[in-house]
Amino acid sequence: MVDALVPTHGGDRVNLDGAAGRIDVIEAHVDDVGVVRDAAAASEVIFNLAGQVSHVESMARPRFDLEINTASQLGFLEILREAGSNAVVVYTSTRQIFGHPRYLPVDEDHPVSPVDVNGISKSATEQLHLLYGELYGVRASSVRLTNVYGPRQRLRDNLQGVLPIFVRRALSGEPITVFGDGAQERDCLYVDDVVECLLLAARSTEVPGEVFNVGNDERLSLRAIAEEVVAAAGSGSIESVPWPHDRDAIDIGSYYGDSSKAKRVLGWEPRTSFADGIARTIEFYRSHRSRYL
């Protein structure tokens, strides 16, 4: 595993405690030529999950976002090209590339029109992966994820998405802040379902050059999500506040994806209901409070 282990973006060796002795951890950036070249040469599959995911952070530090999410990824692809790597590359993109949905559920044919720097950088990097496949034979595909949550996600700041924020505040007995009426709908993906999808993508011979929208058939409003988190935690509360301008400017409204292609091509199905997933998540953090809160 090659990981820069940046703490504020989820890197934490604690997450690997159960895998000691079964994996090699190399602390390096994704565009480190020597490290990536050697790792790629020894790999049949590369799961490319490197990047920063905060939309708000991408607006506050746009150059940083582009450096992490696009420039370094271009360096990674160049390493694969120069090495003539034959590894299958599964890249994790985001639903944010679509911007405001023109129709729901959103399928792969929906126009790409991001509303923040993170969406732009992730969209550009997805296109680079596909381009390097067409021109140089890099066997890349892209899986567009939405609202991933579950054990071992970083909770200590606001850089990993809305669900970690909700979980942290509920477990700390603090109010969960919902902007506006919280009516925007989302589909949330439990981490185990994401892992299964990535493994299926890596095994499929039909995947290189393809993109997949991956979400959950269960749709919940943000307020309903907050209510489920509070109920599972048995603590916390919910307060509604007006939209801050910086958040309102990049909010996309309701979003839920059409995963028909992933189901048809990969044989993937989301198996975890939000109620079950959030209960497992809350229990994990309650049992490991000192490490994550």
Language-model region placement:
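Short, solvent-exposed loop/turn segments at secondary-structure boundaries
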Residues: 60-61, 103, 117, 153-158, ...
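N-terminal Rossmann-like NAD(P)+-binding domain of SDR-like oxidoreductases, especially those catalyzing
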Residues: 1-148, 288
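C-terminal substrate-binding subdomain of Rossmann-fold SDR/epimerase-dehydratase oxidoreductases
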Residues: 28, 171-293
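A conserved pocket-lining segment of Rossmann-fold NAD(P)-dependent short-chain dehydrogenase/reductase
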Residues: 58, 109-110, 138-155, 165-189, ...
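Gly/Ser/Thr-rich beta-alpha loop segments that engage phosphate groups in nucleotides
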Residues: 53, 101, 121, 152, ...
